[in-house]
């Protein structure tokens, strides 16, 4: 059956494929069946040790093929697996393959890799044969992780972490779940792979990786998605902003020698750099994809990326952008310590922390680490991310705060194993692992309970040691003139590999754990763990293989080969740049400006070169203007404004001294003609009047309070905008707390539904039958589906914190032209990615991470113990038409809840 489906709607490269298995000696028996059922060949062998009563047909479903090869002692059999878009093609490929001499095919394959290896940089002979072998294997794994259809698309890993615990038969919205996992393209992981290829001498693949990110993955606003499919399109689990992922491709452009490419600069580098300027230094989440705030590793990437952007701009003769980018990078470098070095923490007088939530590293702010871990004061949570400031050339290894922080992490998150030392991703004052991303072990600082159980499906566990952090520490040691310490780390990484030298994501540092007995539920079964050997996440991890290759060559050269010279020249070789005074006198921060342009005025050092840029929420092409400050230091510039809000960045440059200032103004209405504009009362984010927010500090007041809803169209796109009283980053994403569903009724639509997005879970239906539905959140691409659940197309989702707006943008040609009779039904609730459906749970009274049906001691029918919290409508706020009370509409004690939409007049 070629009628296959997947919830990965952008996987256009995947077509129904036939598979044929041929044996040079035929088969004694064979059977086809359904995975996990009695007809599965594996189940038949387990029960009867034979395929004698097998099956010859298994239409539809998840199919398995099992065959018996007739072979005896000292006899070889060749098997060939053929693929094709037709049955005949698959059979032909298999037959032609099995007809070849295997030794000859193997020899050709081996020679191809030998030719590739011959072109690589050679490690020093004194590293020894074992290290040399692992070096070549590491580079080969990175190269092998590149997709063969889309050059430069390097997967984060060729493994599926804990794939044994994820059933192949899972469905999402009625379609088979696409489990891409690490076999997708993440900009940060691609960059790490790029660095390994670059120092190894494979400039061709390094350039291909750069072009893949810009040509295929980059979003219209200039940013990079968290991850993508191999074709660069959005994956089902794409979501959340990470500024290091937006910055690294710019550095890759410079380091791979593409700075002279004019079109690449105009179409890709400028939008990317403008996005980083507008959103840096602290938007989105840090490199572990868990926390928002000011991250040393993220800001290091921003500084390096913007310095590279300035260098590229100079090559292109674009002096205004060069000054803007470099001055912004200078400001980030100037303030990195004030943002992320605490002087009131428990470990030392001064040290870098993992993340500073507000830019004040001395604030007594606590946050939950996630994945079943606890809540800790930000000053007591440390990681090694600050070492990126050294690797990328922003700070010297000898910097006192760096030196003090290295001692802190070595005392706090370093652990010894039978194969050498390693480091946790992060840690606290606890002597146990507080990272919950990994196979469960107890005692630990997390809530997992079954020792050896995998991280999914509960998304809780225990994090272990990451070999990439050993390489990171080793590169610091080299920069610190301590290669004697870096060498043993290279050896430890090699000894911690799996198979023939595959570098894992995590390594087990605890006591050995035996594998669970055969037949144990895979969701809780231990695969068996040995101290100093790989844990159960991913092996290989492409980043880890690249970091091993990089460290081996760095040790060989006695210096860090990949450190970008343009950054070290700017901040180390010639000393930190000076700082100029800069004041923006108008407009006032947060002012409302509804005109197409805004006049920006201010003062700085007389004769300084002032550059100002304005960027809207859609990013893309930004407005830029420049002028030389007058004799009194005053300056005036005009910039375009945009809908929602406009971020204005101003810089001043005079010789090697710079200055930077940034603010925003609230903009005008949506583009085009507004066809629907409805206000909603403030403070009604309590469902039927009793609902309560979770008690965790992660949930900010007003985050579920819809204040306005609007729809506009301009002949090309339709804009659907939902305004919230408060829109702040939560769990590392700007729309990380919310789950927004919008049901669209179009008159005359052939197929409609009145069901909620998740019938039986959301506990409501829709009054106006809908033919299209949108669902938006911060950790996945927006869903745009029809009444049957099929994908309609790709929607762009733009959030804007200053204006508190979340806007869906879709092509009018697909969505339709909105007119009288259309109805929009809005339902806002909480997102929880730890289970499916991704709706946050309700309990009788609020919990740390659950909504409360009522406050403690609440009265009224809905607060009665007889009301099951699982039966109430999961709607914190909606927009009702005139004459409809939200309190009444959402009260489940009055009968089935039916949401009324707002009609287009």
Where are these regions (language model features)?
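Acidic/polar low-complexity flexible segments
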Residues: 667-679, 746-766, 814-905
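Surface-exposed, glycine/proline- and aromatic-rich loop segments on solvent-exposed faces
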Residues: 670-777, 831-835
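Extended ligand-binding clefts on enzyme/binding-domain cores
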Residues: 13-16, 22-32, 39, 125-126, ...
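C-terminal capping/lid segments that line or modulate ligand- or cofactor-binding pockets
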Residues: 229, 236-256, 367-368, 376-396, ...
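Long, well-ordered core segments of solenoidal/helical folds
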Residues: 142-149, 202-224, 258, 263-285, ...
């Amino acid at each position: 059956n070629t009628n296959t489906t997947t919830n990965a709607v952008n996987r256009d490269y995947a077509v129904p494929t036939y598979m044929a298995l041929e044996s040079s000696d035929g088969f004694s028996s064979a059977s086809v069946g359904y995975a996990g059922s009695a007809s599965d060949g594996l189940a038949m062998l387990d029960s009867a040790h034979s395929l004698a009563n097998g099956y010859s047909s298994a239409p539809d479903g998840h199919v398995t093929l099992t065959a018996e090869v007739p072979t005896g002692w000292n006899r070889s059999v060749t098997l060939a697996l053929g693929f094709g878009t037709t049955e005949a093609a698959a059979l032909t490929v298999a037959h032609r393959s099995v007809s070849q001499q295997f030794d000859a095919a193997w020899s050709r394959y081996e020679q191809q890799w030998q030719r590739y290896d011959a072109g690589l940089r050679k490690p020093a002979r004194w590293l020894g044969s074992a290290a040399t072998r692992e070096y070549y294997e590491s580079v080969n794994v990175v190269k092998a992780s590149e997709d063969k259809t889309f050059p430069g698309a390097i997967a984060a890993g060729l493994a599926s972490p804990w794939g044994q615990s994820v059933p192949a038969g899972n469905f999402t919205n009625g379609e088979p779940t696409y489990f891409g996992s690490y076999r997708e393209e993440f900009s940060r992981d691609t960059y790490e792979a790029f660095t390994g290829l670059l120092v190894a001498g494979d400039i061709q693949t390094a350039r291909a990786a750069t072009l893949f990110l810009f040509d295929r993955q980059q979003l219209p606003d200039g940013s990079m998605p968290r991850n993508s499919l191999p074709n660069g399109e959005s994956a089902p689990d794409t979501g959340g902003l990470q500024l290091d992922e937006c910055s690294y491709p710019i550095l890759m452009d410079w380091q791979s020698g593409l700075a002279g490419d004019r079109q690449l600069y105009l179409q890709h580098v400028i939008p990317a750099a403008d996005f980083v300027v507008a959103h840096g230094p602290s938007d989105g989440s840090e490199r572990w994809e868990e926390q928002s705030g000011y991250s040393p590793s993220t800001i290091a990437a921003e500084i390096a990326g913007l310095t590279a952007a300035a260098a590229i701009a100079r090559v292109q003769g674009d002096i205004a952008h060069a000054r803007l980018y470099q001055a912004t990078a200078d400001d980030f470098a100037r303030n990195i310590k004030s943002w992320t070095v605490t002087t009131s923490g428990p470990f030392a007088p001064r040290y870098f922390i993992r993340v500073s939530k507000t830019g004040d590293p001395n604030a007594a702010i606590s946050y939950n680490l996630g994945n079943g871990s606890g809540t800790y004061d930000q000053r007591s949570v440390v990681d090694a991310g600050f070492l990126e400031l050294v690797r990328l050339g922003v700070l010297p290894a000898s910097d006192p705060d760096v030196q003090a922080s290295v001692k802190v992490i070595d005392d706090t998150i370093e652990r010894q194993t039978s194969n050498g030392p390693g480091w946790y991703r992060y840690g606290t004052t606890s002597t146990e692992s507080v990272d919950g991303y990994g196979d469960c072990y107890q005692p630990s600082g997390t809530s997992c309970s079954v020792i050896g159980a995998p991280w999914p499906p509960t998304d809780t566990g225990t994090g272990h040691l990451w070999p990439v952090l050993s390489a990171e520490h080793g590169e610091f040691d080299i920069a610190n003139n301590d290669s004697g310490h870096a060498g043993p780390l290279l050896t430890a990484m090699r000894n911690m590999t799996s198979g023939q030298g595959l570098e894992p994501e995590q390594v087990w540092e605890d006591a050995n754990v035996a594998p669970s007995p055969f037949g144990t539920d895979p969701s809780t079964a231990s695969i068996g763990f040995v101290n100093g050997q790989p844990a159960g996440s991913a092996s290989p991890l492409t980043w880890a293989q690249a970091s091993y290759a990089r460290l081996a060559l760095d040790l060989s050269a006695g210096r860090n080969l990949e450190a970008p010279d343009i950054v070290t020249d700017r901040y180390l070789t010639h000393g930190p740049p000076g700082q100029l005074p800069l004041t923006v006198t108008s407009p006032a921060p947060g002012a409302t400006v509804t005109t197409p342009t805004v006049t920006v005025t201010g003062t700085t050092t007389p004769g300084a070169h002032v550059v100002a840029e304005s960027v809207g929420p859609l990013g893309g092409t930004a407005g830029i203007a420049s002028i030389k400050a007058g004799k009194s230091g005053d300056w005036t510039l005009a910039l375009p404004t945009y809908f929602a809000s406009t971020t204005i960045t101003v810089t001043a440059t005079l010789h090697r001294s710079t200055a930077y200032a940034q603010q925003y103004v609230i903009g005008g209405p949506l583009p085009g003609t507004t066809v629907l504009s409805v206000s909603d009362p403030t403070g009604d984010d309590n469902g039927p009047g009793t609902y309560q927010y979770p008690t965790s500090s992660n949930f900010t007041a007003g985050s579920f309070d819809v204040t306005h809803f609007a729809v506009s169209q301009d002949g090309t796109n339709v804009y659907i905008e939902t305004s919230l009283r408060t829109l702040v980053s939560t769990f590392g994403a700007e729309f990380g707390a919310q789950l927004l569903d919008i049901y669209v009724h179009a008159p005359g639509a052939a197929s409609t539904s009145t069901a909620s997005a998740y019938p039986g879970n959301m506990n409501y239906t829709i009054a106006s039958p809908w033919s299209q539905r949108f669902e938006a959140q911060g950790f996945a691409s927006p869903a745009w589906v029809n009444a049957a659940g099929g994908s309609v197309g790709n929607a762009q989702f733009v959030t804007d914190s200053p204006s508190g707006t979340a806007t869906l943008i879709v092509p009018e040609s697909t969505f339709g032209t909105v007119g009288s009779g259309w109805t929009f039904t809005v339902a806002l609730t909480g997102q929880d990615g730890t289970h499916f459906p991704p709706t946050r749970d309700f309990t009788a009274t609020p919990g740390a991470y659950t909504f409360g049906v009522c406050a403690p001691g609440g009265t009224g029918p809905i607060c009665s113990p007889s009301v099951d919290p699982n039966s109430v409508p999961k709607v914190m706020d909606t927009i009702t038409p005139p004459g409809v009370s939200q309190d009444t509409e959402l009260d489940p004690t009055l009968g089935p809840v039916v949401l009324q939409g707002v009609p287009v007049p």
